[in-house]
Design a protein with these regions (language model features):
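N-terminal lobe/hinge region of extracytoplasmic solute-binding protein
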Residues: 63-117, 257
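Detector for C-terminal structural segments
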Residues: 379-426, 478, 482-492, 518-675
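Ligand/substrate-recognition segments at binding pockets and active sites
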Residues: 269, 307, 397-398, 434-533, ...
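N-terminal secretory signal peptides
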Residues: 1-10, 14, 18-28
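Alpha-helical secondary-structure segments
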Residues: 139, 143-149, 209-215, 261, ...
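Aromatic- and charge-enriched surface segment that lines or borders ligand/interaction sites
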Residues: 110-175, 213, 304-307, 366-372, ...
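Gly/Pro-rich hinge or "lid" segments in bacterial periplasmic/extracellular proteins
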Residues: 187-201, 205-210, 215-294, 655-675
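Extracellular/periplasmic solute-recognition and catalytic clefts
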Residues: 67, 265-279, 294-361, 387, ...
């Protein structure tokens, strides 16, 4: 999956409602004020919130999101972006959730089991789950039928437009055939219902109102991780009929139905979202929730710091300049409160656009020729020193952010306990290299010297009419000075690593939507974007870049290599050969279903081929420093799925947590994982 005051009698909620964030910061600097009483011994309802320090927990909490990560779809069955899931995970539950250690735990399913060869999985459902509307009024009872309706919606090309079909079509008997059937039927498929799906032989049945049985194509011992994804979430046929297909597909917080821990109290686009407890939440007695959770959209980290200082945010991530301001003054009150967060479960990469357009819609032939050249791409992976850029995200330990792989660390382990990316490292030849805080691992073999590659690329490209320097167009949101600062450092990294005679970064801006203003018209040379796993297997990462697959997200929506494949130019022959070879390697690995170790070894070879040919160039892991009133280690920490922003069972404190406390949290977490 593919990021976002108070004075006198003005409450935090009413202030944020009445003013934009930028205006709010100005008002705060003029009048200040103290935070309203927001603490208490318990959260909104149900269980006590975790409390390992004896602190006074918060009843209300104000978090933040980057302004460029505003929600675009409220429909979890339709959306494929993490920025959407981060919101809707609080509103819409599926079969399972996760705990703070990343372990699968019951949600609507109370238990599940597989047969001996893991081809048949049975899920047992709760009998006390209801759909409610935006006012918290009960609309319908949830049964196994709602999960049948949900899967039919996902697999129906006319309804869900091919979104989120990869998991069910890869794993469920008959799912791919049913999807193709609906695709061939065109608009007529809109009339199909879940019974039509069952009659077509799709491997899902509901023997009673509270039992679901999935039949997999092949043995799949990790299918429970697959079933945790949003492709398998419930939907109400009553609501679909009431709204109609197009309106349900584009539903929003006012007309959707809820079954998660919260409902939306208020949504101001580009400003705030506030959630209050779902009064009919099935698990209310067993989880702690906030009386109000507010998410404020932040366009600038400097503003975020000011809001935090005024207690109009309860947590912020710190950029390089703010950390420098704090650490350069030994008397700064925040020195003892700097908290290094654990890595977010995602991996960021530079996704090249192989079919770039100019602003007037004509092809950018110079870039398209350059990026099709293998030596040109290899300069990015083997020569681009990003240490200074990493400092923008982690000033104190920048190289902790280095990402050398396409698949994120921690996704899965083989039967010998080897973490998957260590297998990729072995294929790449740097498995013996360790973090040293000084040099990027992938630059150590040649010291970052790409002079021979650069010479080769320039000679080969000059011969086909490419002019230098090649302009690499990179877009940032216009309203963010932090994004501009980050891009300025990245531009200097390009200059220092490539030389201004070879590749120059051209920083451009968009107003509000990267998708609508940049990706859809194909204006970018590359986008740096993160992927969080949907389930616990490498195919979920590597399958997003393959050819000949409608579900390969990046191939269709970022690199546009799927479009190139329709009519490649002569200069793109080698590029297409590389993608075909990569696709064959991925498909061969995915065909290994009875030997986990052999499967992962084969995927590692495919990933190494991708990296050697730099079809994508990995960039960083998100390991930030923060100031916070929440214990990060109490939050959901799933390696896959979209549940990590679900605000249940958070440990919070009226007083900010300290560096020492966070170090203790980290040690306790590591001990629990290892024990």
């Amino acid at each position: 999956m593919n990021i976002d005051f108070e004075s006198r009698n003005i409450t935090r909620r009413s202030f944020l409602k009445g003013a934009g964030v930028v205006g709010a910061a100005g008002l705060l600097s003029a009048c200040g004020g103290s935070k309203s009483n927001n603490s208490g011994s318990t959260a909104a309802s149900g269980a006590q919130a975790p409390n390992s320090t004896g602190a006074t927990p918060l009843k209300e909490y104000i978090s933040w999101e980057s302004a460029n990560r505003e929600i675009e779809s409220w429909n979890l069955l339709y959306s494929q972006t993490l920025s959407d899931a981060n919101v809707v995970t609080n509103l819409w539950d599926g079969l399972m959730s996760f705990d703070c250690y990343g372990k699968l735990v019951p949600a609507i399913a109370t238990s599940w089991e597989a047969n001996e060869d893991s081809t048949v999985w049975t899920f047992h459902l709760r009998d006390d789950v209801d759909w409610v509307d935006c006012n918290g009024e009960v609309k319908e009872h949830i049964t196994a039928t709602d999960f049948l309706v949900g899967l039919e919606w996902v697999l129906n090309a006319s309804k869900n437009e091919a979104n989120n079909t990869s998991m069910p079509t890869l794993y469920i008997v008959g799912a791919e055939e049913y999807y193709e059937k609906t695709k061939d039927m065109g608009a007529a498929a809109a009339d199909l219902r879940y019974q039509d799906m069952l009659d077509a032989g799709v491997g899902l049945e509901a023997p009673d109102d509270y039992t679901l049985v999935f039949t997999c194509k092949d043995p799949c011992p990790y299918f429970d991780t697959v079933a945790s994804y949003t492709s398998f979430y419930p939907a109400s046929q009553v609501l679909i009929d009431e709204l109609g297909i197009e309106t349900f597909r584009g539903c929003d917080n006012t007309n959707m139905w809820y079954c998660g821990p919260y409902i939306v109290e208020e949504y101001i686009q580009g400003n705030t979202k506030s959630y209050i407890p779902n009064p009919h939440y099935y698990d209310a007695a067993n989880v702690s929730r906030f009386e109000r959770l507010t998410v404020t959209m932040i366009s600038d980290q400097a503003i975020a710091f000011q809001l935090y200082q005024n207690r109009e945010l309860d947590e912020i991530d710190l950029n390089e300049s703010t950390i420098t301001t704090i650490t350069s003054d030994p008397n700064n009150e925040y020195n003892s409160q700097l908290c290094e967060k654990r890595a977010r479960p995602s991996a960021y990469a530079m996704h090249f656009n192989y079919q770039k357009n100019n602003a007037d819609g004509t092809p950018d032939v110079n870039w398209n020729k350059a990026i099709a050249n293998t030596a040109f791409r290899q300069c990015f992976y083997r020569g681009l020193n990003l240490k200074a850029w990493f400092s923008r995200y982690n000033k104190i330990n920048p190289l902790k952010c280095e990402n050398d792989y396409y698949t994120m660390k921690g996704l899965c382990y083989n039967t010998q306990g080897a973490e998957y990316t260590t297998l990729v490292a072995k294929e790449m030849g740097f498995d013996a290299e360790k973090y040293d805080g000084e040099t990027m691992i992938r630059l150590r073999a040649n010291g970052g010297d790409i002079s021979a590659l650069k010479k080769q690329a320039m000679e080969e490209l000059s011969a086909i009419g490419v002019t230098f320097p090649v302009k690499a167009t990179y877009f940032i949101i216009a309203s963010s000075t932090s994004a501009l600062d980050n891009a300025t450092i990245l531009k200097q990294c390009f200059s220092d690593s490539f030389g201004d005679d070879f590749i120059k970064l051209d920083v451009q801006t968009y107003v509000s939507s990267l998708t609508q203003e940049v990706r859809t018209p194909q204006l970018q040379s590359f986008v740096i974007n993160g992927w969080s796993a949907d389930f616990g297997d490498p195919i979920n990462f590597l399958g997003q870049e393959t050819l000949h697959d409608d579900n390969a997200f990046y191939s269709h929506y970022y690199s546009n290599i799927a479009r190139v494949a329709e009519a490649p130019a002569d200069y793109q022959k080698d590029l297409m050969d590389a993608f075909e070879q990569y696709t064959d390697l991925v498909n061969a690995a995915n065909a290994i279903v009875n030997d986990t170790d052999a499967r992962y070894e084969a995927f590692a070879k495919a990933e190494a081929y991708m990296l050697e040919n730099v079809l994508v160039s990995p960039t960083y892991y998100d390991i930030a420093w923060s100031l916070t009133h929440a214990n990060e280690y109490s939050k959901i920490n799933a390696m896959y799925g979209g549940c990590n922003y679900k605000a249940v069972n958070w440990e919070t404190s009226e007083e900010a947590y300290t560096t020492v406390q966070y170090e203790q949290f980290a040690k306790a977490f590591d001990a629990a994982i290892q024990g």
